[in-house]
Structures are given as C-alpha cells and as structure tokens.
Amino acid sequence: LFPHRPPATDGAGRIRQNEEYPTVNIVRIDDLDLPGLDDYARLTDVVLRRLREPAGGLYIAESSKVIARALAAGHRPRSVLVQEQWLGDMESLLAGWDDVTVFVGDAATLESLTGYNLHRGALAAMHRPELRPVADVIQGARRIVVLEDITDHTNVGAIFRAVAGIGADAVLISPRCADPLYRRSVRVSMGTVLQVPWTRLPEWSEAAPLLHAAGFHIAALALSENAVTLDEFAADVPSKLALVLGSEGDGLSRQALSAADTVVTIPMSHGVDSLNVASASAVALYTLR
C-alpha cells in the first residue's frame, strides 16, 4: 500500500524522532509495563478482548492497509504498535494526526506482548466512533443487510466484505450480534467494516416497524416450507430491500421470521441443506443486486 521506508536513526543506529512528522511520538519498547501498552496485551485472550475493547471505547486495527482505511474513515488513533522495519511507513501514514504515540519493538518483543506473531507488521488502538441512529444509516439506502445474532466474528467480517464488494448500502446488526470492530472481524473484512455504514438495531418489536416505515421489504433468508427460491424472488426484487441473515446454529428467530414480508431460500443439492451464512450472503447479494 505504501513504499517501504526505513525508520529514521541517529549516527549510532538508534531510532530518533522524525523531523518530517514531529507530531509522531516514537517510544522504543524496553519494558512491557510501559503506560499505553495494555491496549495490546494478550490479544489472543478472546473473552478479555470482547470485554475490554468496547468498554474502553477502542478497537484494534491490524496491518497498514486496515489502519489506512480506519484513518480515511476519520477514526482517531490512540497509539500504534509497529515492528522496527515498518516504522518509516507508519510515520508517513500518520502524518497530520496530532500526538500519536508509536510503540516500536522487534518481532520477539511484540509477540511477547500480544501473544502472537505480528506478521502484518503493525497494530493500532483506535478510538471507536459513536454509533449512528438507524434512520441516518438507512437514509437513501436501497439494499441493506440485517444480521441477527451472528456471533462468529469471522462470519461477520466476511459478510461485510461481501456487502462492500457486491454493493449493498448498509448493515444493521441485532443487539446480540458479534462486534464488527473486533480484531478478527476487521481483519477478515479487509477493513471494509470501516467503510460500510452500519449500526445496531433495537429488538424486532421496534426494528420491523422502523424498517417498514422507511419503505423496506424485509426478506429473511431461511429454510422454511413457505419460502420462495432465491431465483423466484430475484425475478421481481422490491425497490428497497432489507435482507435478514441469521446464525448458522439456530437460524433466524421466530420474531425475525414473523417480521419478514418474504422468506427466501437458496436451493441446494447432494443432501446439503444450506451454505455457510457468509457464503449465503454473497450468493444472495449477487443474485439480488
């Protein structure tokens, strides 16, 4: 994404403050208890990250490409953790952002801190943006995707990537859906969770009237005796469509199915009853584009 540029050093080979980007505060990691490093500690502890990141108003962006997309979306960095050889690239990427601390260390030090091999070179602790009202997110939208209680972060990230790549306008997620800004979701989405407009929905008792009032036809993707096939539905797609996807284990709730104007299914063969929800989202979005 950016031409590789080595870190600035003094005559003795020590990393020094870069004069071209004076607002970047470079801190060489010589102690894992340095203030600010808690944001990156034990990244492999899934339960801890789920509890700590949202509560702290932060999310973790991994790789220079994802960090660049976060910055382009206007998300403010709190700090960056980077391997020495990628410091030059990160300094140029952060140009114009005031008072950003960049923690620098070798691969072994960063792995000791985070709990895994930082093969993508950089992490950033980003301040979470405030969630927008549903009405703002769906204003002007023609195709939206609704995720109900999908708790697998990989699936959430893959669905966002499909939404961005195939061209839906927004994503709405249920109160119990996995966090799109969890590190794995962001990574799997290739940073598209930072581009696609999204927010959380209230419960269906409020969400369905809200979507209907905005003119959306609610189509639930599910296995049902009353379902129409995807091809049948695609023959006459409503002008404003909300496509609802559920978890692979339990599927959609009774409330979601009751709220739907149409239940749609993807016909399968060879004894397979359904696709992975992320794959199903891509098939449905492409067919209904």
Regions found by a protein language model. Name each.
Residues 122-124, 162-166, 180, 184-193, ...:
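Structured adenosyl-cofactor binding patch, chiefly the S-adenosyl-L-methionine
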Residues 27, 72, 129-226:
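RNA substrate-binding interface of SAM-dependent RNA methyltransferases
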Residues 88-99, 256:
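Short, aromatic/basic amphipathic alpha-helical patches
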Residues 1-23:
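N-terminal amphipathic/basic-hydrophobic helices that include classical n-h-c signal peptides
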Residues 98-115, 199:
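A glycine-rich helix N-cap at a beta->alpha junction
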Residues 219-272:
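Active-site/ligand-binding-proximal alpha/beta "capping" segment
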Residues 17-85:
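Boundary-proximal intrinsically disordered activation/regulatory segments immediately upstream
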